[in-house]
Amino acid sequence: MVKSYTLGKSERLKSRKRLEALFKGGKSFSHFPFRVYYILSSESKTEAHTPPLVFGVGVGTRNFKKAVDRNRIKRLIREAYRLQKQLLVQKLNARGGRMDLFFIFTGKEIPDYSFLFQHMQTVLQQLEQRIDQSYE
């Protein structure tokens, strides 16, 4: 049985090289309270042992001066993503592609988990549509 509700170390976007490529050459869109950056690529160009979906999250210091607040928001976003990423992973596996994904929180107040969960669902549905469009 595959563990589908996990967000392990290999699924986190931490490589400086990949982050630079994502912000320079990737596509982006906004859906409050997120700014989403992503790059779609085919499986053949990348290493075979990497997961199909790699994820990162950031919260700016402009609106949240305290690290405690930034870390709480990042934890909430990671949890909302972890519980809803399965459809996106299945779609990428079916298409034979992979995606680097980075969320930047653009809100000005600490959100409730239910608010983030709903908006994460909408953003992931938009990403599914973009995957379908790119493989047509």
Where do the protein language model's features map onto the residues?
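Positively charged, solvent-exposed patches that mediate nucleic-acid binding
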Residues: 1-136
